[in-house]
From Swiss-Prot:
Residues the record lists as binding a ubiquinone: 61
Assembly and interaction partners: Fungal cytochrome b-c1 complex contains 10 subunits; 3 respiratory subunits, 2 core proteins and 5 low-molecular weight proteins. Cytochrome b-c1 complex is a homodimer.
Localization (cell): Mitochondrion inner membrane
Protein name per UniProt: Cytochrome b
Assigned protein family: Belongs to the cytochrome b family.
Organism: Aspergillus flavus
């Protein structure tokens, strides 16, 4: 459903819609390769968002600083970022990555779903992502464009 909706939505853009669809999916049809690309895209998006958040933090703290949002030149308006908080945050991140590594390396399927091993089938919507009945008219309108 998601790949079909995105495909139809992108193809509705005048002049460049077909090119966008072919760029995203490699073609207009929704088949096994398309669904695998869709799943891979959804795997990568959280990392892209994390990178954008990190870039935002770096840019925010680089010149003006979070304690000086107006850009006032005097240092008396800035609040120093205490080294204690940096150390505390680093310890927390370190512990988080240790726990995450235990799950990833020793129990990789503990937090997974058995449906992850089912081959993608474009003709059958998995029960977990069947759209709600009240969204079906909007999908029908979108498909008719």
């Amino acid at each position: 459903w998601g790949a079909t909706v995105i495909t139809n939505l992108m193809s509705a853009i005048p002049w460049i819609g077909q090119d966008i669809v072919e760029f995203i999916w490699g073609g207009f049809s929704v088949n096994n390769a398309t669904l695998n690309r869709f799943f891979a895209l959804h795997f990568l998006l959280p990392f892209v968002l994390a990178a954008l958040a990190l870039m935002h933090l770096i840019a925010m703290h680089d010149t003006v600083g979070s304690g000086n949002p107006l850009g006032i030149s005097g240092n008396y308006d800035r609040l120093p970022f205490a080294p204690y908080f940096i150390f505390k945050d680093l310890v927390t991140i370190f512990i988080f990555f240790i726990v995450l590594s235990i799950f990833v390396f020793f129990m990789p399927n503990a937090l997974g779903d058995s449906e992850n091993y089912v081959m993608a089938n474009p003709m059958q919507t998995p029960p977990a992502i069947v759209p709600e009945w009240y969204l079906l008219p909007f999908y029908a309108i979108l498909r008719s464009i």
